[in-house]
Amino acid sequence: MTERQKTYFDLSIGGKPAGRVVFEVYSDVTPKTAENFVRLCAGDAGECRTKPGVPLCYQGSLFHRVIKGFMCQFGDFTNGDGTGGESIYGEKFEDENFARKHDRPFLLSMANAGPNTNGSQCFITCAPTPHLDGKHVVFGEVIQGKRVVRAIERQETAADRPLADVRIDACGILPASYEVPADAEATPADEYGDDYEETLADDAKVDLADPRSVIRAVEAVKAIGTAQLQAARFDVAVQKYAKAAGFLQEYFPDDLPDADVAALEQLKVAVHLNLALAALKAGNHQRVLSAASEVLHGAADDKAKAKALYRRGLAYHHLKDPEMALTDLELAATYQPGDAGIAQAIVNARALKQKLREQQKKALSKMFS
């Protein structure tokens, strides 16, 4: 059996080292396509025919196209914008086969401009992409550095191009004896004690088949958010609550027992209430609106609805929208009659409404005086 070769990219994002990604290519399934990639990593295939003087090598080139939830594309070392690149066999070569499917994230596949137009451009899948089956040749996978791929996937983009350069600083072939370290994909805890990946599916600690494992992950990150809220690190609290909320959004299989659905729904309400509170204290009023709205669209009881409406009403007040603030606050009062905080917020919103009305009158009188 043909031994599968391993190659690596050492990457930087915005000029800062981002880590190493290690690939295993399917030399036994797609030998010609795999050999093209390996030689372009090694940089030992000479110069481009289309651009003499430019090495046939990925080193120094960029990830020029990134679409979250889809793929990260690279390999245009001649033009840098997706219009160039070249294979070791010439400008283009044929589709070898479509034996492997795009059935999971972290697969390595050839980019092309149609049938039999493979060059040097490739992409890493960020999710299953079955619509590409039969059109693009899957020839390898990421076996180390999945967190680095996710970091690339999360980059802010304009027209799908990362705003910060994602560069292949170095690349090459690893020895046949190379083995991925046992702890290579372990998530290091951050300074707040959070050792969970940004995506549940990427975290080896979480068993997606067990709702209790998911709940433990959400509660752990939520607890970190609460600790940061109590320490008045409001921006960090927002980040952690948002991460916990993202876990819940990511996970909700159709076949869960009713008891597990109820537990997850209640946890979702609690996380979004806390997110709204932390965002309010951080001055992130748009985030308050979205988090509070999630509570109101969920399985919230009257007490939770009152809190969500109160926090959303305060956010509208800060956004100088007293009409919306009063709508929320007056409805909150029906769920929590006699609450002094809600009552005072209503008084404040009415005062803001009057103040803005008087300012408008003055502005109009100046226009017509």
From Swiss-Prot:
GO cellular component, one term: cytoplasm
TPR repeat start and end residues: 218-251, 269-302, 306-339
Family matches, as Gene3D superfamilies: Cyclophilin-like, Tetratricopeptide repeat domain
Enzyme Commission number(s) of this protein: 5.2.1.8
CDD domains: cyclophilin_ABH_like (cd01926)
UniProt keyword annotations, A-Z: Cytoplasm, Isomerase, Repeat, Rotamase, TPR repeat
Reactions catalysed, as given in the entry: [protein]-peptidylproline (omega=180) = [protein]-peptidylproline (omega=0)
Superkingdom field: Eukaryota
Membrane-crossing residue ranges in chain numbering: none
One example of a Gene Ontology biological process annotation: protein refolding
Chief location category: cytoplasm
Keyword Ion transport attributed: no
PPIase cyclophilin-type domain: residues covered: 8-173
Function according to Swiss-Prot or TrEMBL: PPIases accelerate the folding of proteins. It catalyzes the cis-trans isomerization of proline imidic peptide bonds in oligopeptides.
Matching PANTHER family: PEPTIDYL-PROLYL CIS-TRANS ISOMERASE (PTHR11071), PEPTIDYL-PROLYL CIS-TRANS ISOMERASE D-RELATED (PTHR11071:SF561)
Family per record: Belongs to the cyclophilin-type PPIase family. PPIase D subfamily.
Protein's name according to its UniProt entry: Peptidyl-prolyl cis-trans isomerase D
